[in-house]
Swiss-Prot record:
Subcellular location field: Cytoplasm; Synapse; Cell projection, Dendritic spine
GO terms assigned for molecular function: microtubule binding; PDZ domain binding; protein-containing complex binding; scaffold protein binding
The entry's keywords: Cell projection, Cytoplasm, Disease variant, Dwarfism, Ectodermal dysplasia, Hypotrichosis, mRNA processing, mRNA splicing, Spliceosome, Synapse
Native organism: Homo sapiens (Human)
Start and end residues of each stretch annotated as Sufficient for interaction with DLG4: 95-101
Function per UniProt: As a component of the minor spliceosome, involved in the splicing of U12-type introns in pre-mRNAs. Involved in the cytoskeletal anchoring of DLG4 in excitatory synapses.
Family recorded in the similarity comment: Belongs to the CRIPT family.
Keyword match Cytoplasm: yes
Entry keyword annotation includes Cytoplasm: yes
Highest taxon listed in the record's lineage: Eukaryota
Major location category of this protein: cytoplasm
Stretch list, region PDZ3-binding: 98-101
GO cellular component terms attached to this protein's record: cytoplasm; dendrite; dendritic shaft; dendritic spine; glutamatergic synapse; neuronal cell body; postsynaptic density; postsynaptic density, intracellular component
Protein name per the record: Cysteine-rich PDZ-binding protein
Length: 101
């Protein structure tokens, strides 16, 4: 669960955009090369388990968080009804039985 403010902070997917005027993946603007595998060529998007940008641990259950910039794992964020990135209350879970199974 992510709040509206933190949705802007989420990363973009490696797949190209659908074609439209002004898209960032068109060849005319020089933004995207043809026959390029972005998963192999982009060094900053590649996962480095021992590097500086390691994933943090959840503040509640201490498990590893698989989203850069998040402080809570998705299971704990769902159970508590909070944003996974900032911890802001998103959903009132008073009358719910929240399970992550």
């Amino acid at each position: 669960m992510v709040c509206e403010k933190c949705e802007k902070k989420l990363g973009t997917v490696i797949t190209p955009d659908t074609w439209k005027d002004g898209a960032r993946n068109t060849t005319e603007s020089g933004g995207r090369k043809l026959n390029e595998n972005k998963a192999l060529t982009s060094k900053k998007a590649r996962f480095d388990p021992y590097g500086k940008n390691k994933f943090s641990t959840c503040r509640i259950c201490k498990s590893s968080v698989h989203q850069p910039g998040s402080h809570y794992c998705q299971g704990c964020a769902y159970k508590k009804g909070i944003c996974a990135m900032c911890g802001k209350k998103v959903l009132d879970t008073k009358n719910y039985k929240q399970t992550s199974v």
